[in-house]
């Protein structure tokens, strides 16, 4: 979805992923953009894809653990140097709790964090996307097939406060232990909340989410029937060396 917005709308992103190395995030973005494994790219393609990633994404190093206020401060510094359309925090649950001298509890701290992110988003016209884990109880819930079902919005760690503050809320669910290989490749996209439905968006039916199917190379997604890709991969013109004019020697 992040690569989709960058390719279709030229969005510029700031990404903090505490569970993935910076190089790994960049490599995955390169592969999604090109719809090709890095190992299958030519040197010129790798160079151009890396340049494209550098131009669209600022990746925050995960050598340190940051609080939500650290992320906002970093965003403000980046925005003074370049335009930013969105930030992705993966996951919010990994951010450290910085409650020294605040005199508030954990519940109020997280509500304050959600409010601060919302205020920052509105004030700067920047989309703030927080990736969050579900509570343990939701992970135990099984469907008729014996596999975990998609958690509800209120199953998010921290409860309904994040649902209440968010403009949009989505749940992405995969059945990675399904016996059917095709089902393993599916990602269910449940739109749980859309605040402004007047602009055209709306929640998905409870039992009828959008379904995206990962391709065989794990470098892109199509619709459930595999008929249409989410976006066309970017292409670069191979640079060719100009022929050397040796006529002056004759």
Model-identified regions with their sequence ranges:
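Walker A/P-loop NTP-binding motif
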Residues: 1-8
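Short, hydrophobic alpha-helix immediately C-terminal to the catalytic nucleophile
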Residues: 3, 115-118
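Conserved inter-motif catalytic segment of the P-loop NTP-binding fold
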Residues: 9-107, 112
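Structural recognition of the conserved hydrophobic beta-strand(s) that form the central parallel beta-sheet
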Residues: 15, 88-89, 126-133
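Conserved RecA-like P-loop NTPase ATPase core
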Residues: 19, 59, 90, 117, ...
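C-terminal regions of RecA-like/P-loop NTPase motor modules
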Residues: 68-85, 101, 119-124, 137-250
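Signature of the SF2 helicase/ATPase Hel1-core->accessory helical subdomain module
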Residues: 94, 133-136
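Charged helix-capping and loop-helix junction motifs
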Residues: 107-115, 152-155
């Amino acid at each position: 979805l992040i690569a989709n917005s960058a390719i279709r709308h030229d969005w510029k992103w700031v990404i903090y992923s505490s569970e993935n190395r910076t190089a790994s995030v960049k490599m995955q973005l390169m592969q999604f953009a090109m719809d090709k494994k890095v190992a299958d790219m030519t040197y010129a393609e790798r160079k151009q894809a890396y340049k494209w990633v550098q131009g669209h994404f600022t990746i925050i190093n995960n050598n340190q653990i940051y609080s939500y206020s650290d992320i906002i401060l970093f965003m403000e510094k980046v925005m003074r140097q370049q335009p930013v359309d969105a930030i992705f925090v993966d996951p919010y649950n990994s951010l450290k709790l910085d409650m020294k001298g605040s005199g508030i509890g954990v519940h109020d701290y997280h509500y304050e964090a959600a409010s601060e992110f919302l205020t920052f988003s509105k004030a700067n016209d920047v989309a703030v996307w927080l990736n969050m884990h579900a509570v343990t109880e939701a992970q135990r819930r099984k469907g008729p097939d014996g596999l975990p079902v998609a958690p509800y919005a209120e199953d998010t760690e921290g409860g309904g406060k994040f649902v209440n503050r968010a403009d949009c809320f989505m749940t992405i669910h995969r059945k990675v232990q399904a016996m059917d290989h095709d089902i393993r490749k599916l990602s269910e996209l449940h739109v749980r909340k859309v605040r402004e439905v007047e602009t055209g968006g709306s929640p998905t039916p409870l039992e009828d989410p959008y379904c995206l199917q990962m391709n065989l190379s794990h470098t892109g997604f199509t619709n459930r029937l595999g008929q249409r890709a989410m976006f066309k991969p970017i292409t670069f013109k191979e640079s060719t060396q100009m022929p050397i004019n040796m006529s002056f020697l004759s």
